[in-house]
């Protein structure tokens, strides 16, 4: 494969392009979170209704990831990503013009097409390098990517306080246009195109689903990130209704998780080859679980508050930053020739589980509730991730895999 040359669409992309593509996908998920209570007032609906803009977005992202992978294996990463960006821009315009909560939710769901950025940035990395190298490169890519959502809620909260919630979606529109131009100029095709039909590619799913290691890696990633998705679904309510914080304050506190995630990504990028994928995943899952257990204990002891609740989520970010690059590389390595399909299917399971947990978090929180139900949900999800990766390690020893 040719060496990447910046702004040359005949060669593979530079890392910065993959960072920005994946970053836009992540930013779309969280920039508007501090605005959720205000959006509920704007449309005169309950917080639970507007919170579904998170859960429904994640659910459609999961569905799309099932087909994005196989389509990109057949038609190429470049064409699929460019088409997805165009559709994302149209959906974003729709969110700005939506007159009702229902129409907003429809366009918000359509924005989920940007999930192609997450799927294909990982698949492009796997096209270019293999195994532990892929884990290391994904670690560096997601470390850079995490800088975008790190400041996203902060910017979103400030924009909401100054100009209203629509300013967040206007910013996404501008960034989407810039990303489209960059992808057009820099992302050359990296996939070895497979001249088979989409139906034939989907029929390869059983080969992946029959792999215990694929399930182990996928569930480890799903439960580890599920802790974070539950947090996304419930933290805006906790910050606004329980702690009485402003949108700007909530957005700033969201950055703590992202700081931990960036640190975890750096650790993954630096040490994945030396320590190994499976042990790195286990370390990440344990870090998250210990952090959530400490948060639950302090809350039970009556030491709850914004500092405790938001501060300890830095461990969740750190653990996810270590776990996810390695878990993603692991599920892609099970069948390397199906990297795009594995990325899409694994991502669908991961995001689908996240959608369910985000929706459940919204159900748990309501008038008179405390933060404890959300904390216990996050703890249960992180503990399940430890069980999943221990299964992978046991299975790897049985078959002699690395």
Task: Give the positions of each predicted feature.
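A late C-terminal transmembrane helix in Major Facilitator Superfamily
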Residues: 328, 332-368, 378
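Paired small-residue
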Residues: 87, 91-94, 102-110, 307-313
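Helix-loop-helix hairpin linking two adjacent transmembrane segments in secondary transporters
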Residues: 103, 139-185
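Membrane-interface helix termini in secondary transporters
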Residues: 38, 66-70, 74, 158, ...
């Amino acid at each position: 494969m040719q060496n990447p040359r910046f702004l040359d669409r005949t060669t593979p992309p530079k890392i910065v392009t993959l960072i920005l593509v994946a970053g836009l996908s992540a930013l779309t998920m969280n920039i508007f979170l501090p605005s959720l209570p205000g959006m509920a007032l704007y449309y005169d609906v309950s917080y639970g209704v507007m919170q579904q803009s998170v859960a429904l977005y994640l659910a459609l992202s999961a569905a799309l990831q099932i087909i994005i992978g196989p389509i990109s294996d057949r038609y190429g990463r470049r064409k699929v990503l460019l088409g997805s960006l165009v559709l994302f821009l149209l959906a974003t315009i729709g969110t700005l013009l939506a007159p009702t909560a229902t129409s907003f939710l429809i366009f918000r769901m359509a924005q989920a097409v940007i999930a192609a950025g997450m799927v294909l940035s990982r698949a492009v990395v796997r096209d270019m390098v293999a195994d532990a190298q892929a884990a290391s490169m994904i670690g560096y890519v997601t470390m850079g990517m995490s800088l975008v959502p790190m400041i996203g809620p902060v910017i979103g909260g400030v924009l909401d306080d100054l100009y209203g919630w629509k300013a967040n979606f206007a910013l996404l529109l501008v960034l989407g246009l810039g990303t489209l131009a960059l992808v057009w100029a820099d992302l050359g095709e990296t996939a070895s195109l497979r001249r088979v039909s989409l139906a034939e590619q989907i029929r390869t799913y059983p080969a992946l689903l029959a792999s215990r290691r694929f399930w182990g890696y996928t569930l480890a990633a799903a439960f580890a990130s599920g802790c974070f998705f539950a947090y996304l679904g419930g933290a805006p309510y906790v910050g606004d209704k329980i702690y009485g914080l402003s949108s700007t304050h909530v957005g700033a506190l969201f950055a703590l998780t992202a700081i931990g995630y960036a640190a975890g990504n750096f650790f993954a990028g630096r040490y994945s080859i030396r320590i190994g994928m499976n042990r790195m995943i286990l370390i990440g899952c344990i870090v998250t679980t210990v952090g959530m257990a400490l948060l639950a204990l302090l809350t039970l002891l009556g030491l709850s508050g914004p500092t405790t609740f938001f501060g300890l989520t830095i461990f969740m970010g750190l653990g996810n930053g270590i776990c996810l690059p390695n878990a993603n590389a692991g599920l892609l390595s099970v069948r390397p020739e199906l990297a795009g399909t594995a990325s899409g299917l694994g991502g669908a399971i991961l995001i689908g589980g996240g959608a369910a947990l985000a929706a459940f978090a919204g159900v748990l929180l309501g008038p008179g509730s405390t933060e404890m139900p959300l904390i216990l949900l996050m703890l249960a999800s992180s503990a399940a991730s430890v069980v999943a990766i221990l299964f992978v390690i046991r299975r790897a020893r049985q078959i002699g895999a690395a």
